[in-house]
Amino acid sequence: MRKTIALGVALCFGAACAEVKSQDAWEWHDGSALPQEGRGFSDTATPYVRIPDRLRGNCSGAVWGLSRNSSGICYRFSTDSRQMRVKWTVGDPVLSTHNMTGAGRSGVDVYGWDEGTKTWRFVKGSRPKKTDNEISFPWTPGRPCMIYLPLYNEVVRFEVGVLKGSKVAPLPPRASGVSKPVVCYGTSITHGASASRPGLSWTAQAARRADVPFVNLGFAGSGKMEPSMVDVVAEIDASLYVLDCLWNMSPKLVEERFEPFVRELHRRRPTTPILCAEDCSTFRDRTEKGIMAEKIVAKLKAEDPVAWKDLHFIPNTEQMARDCEETVDGCHPNDCGMRQMGIGFGNRYKQILGLK
């Protein structure tokens, strides 16, 4: 009798699974129609790139190429579907590199809101094996969802599937009340190297910690504060600008570009706070350029304490512990280092923006 009941339950469960897996049971929503965050410009060539064609002349060749990567772009929505599927296609067949996993470079990352802890919790990652990929997972109807796009690859297609008849809706405004993004301009570390998956980049972790949207303008090896890049950064109406470029700059470049860049950004957005970040290293004490940058910030604040009251500096001691365990190569943070940076920057966001 027990065997008969168990067999019946198994058959019913199997039939339900088969029905859900049937292509006819799904409705697909293209990324262009889903509630999206993290894209600083509405007129990009596709929904998955970071800088529009009209600003190509402001970018170096390297920055322009890297702006095709979807780092920081994410989707936030709720659905009453009990199961979801995600399909995406990346443009670069090189899915992983020496210091980036396939999941981080080319994968998507799914988070769900946990009402009990009031935090976003990891739900489903991905292991891309080719340029076309798909994942599926059960879902609690009504639970808020957030899906991060790949850090270091170009997305050419993105779709979310829900069971037919299910609704997909944007999330309500954040509890923090912050609607304008934190705009992070920087280097490969800002870009996301070397988080094992997109949701573990420090920019994503800091944003979740402070409950704010963010835009990622990190460009590997290319965060050099060129004067023309002020146009790109300042065009985005931000709640806070984060400048994390020292890793890619020599002392000479810091001397030439740091102060003019900060002054021009402040001139264009005089009421928006600016957070300048020191570079840091596992193996070295403070660098000459880090000390230079801190002195420039202090000089500006002394020059006019009222005008520059919202200019801030985050030292390396608030970013990584420098215990030799937080990087993959002595420079790029691993997940441990990314968490340390996410906490440090997230705490600063809350302090600067007056959040609890």
Regions found by a protein language model. Name each.
Residues R284-K356:
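Catalytic His-Asp segment of secreted/periplasmic serine-dependent ester chemistry enzymes
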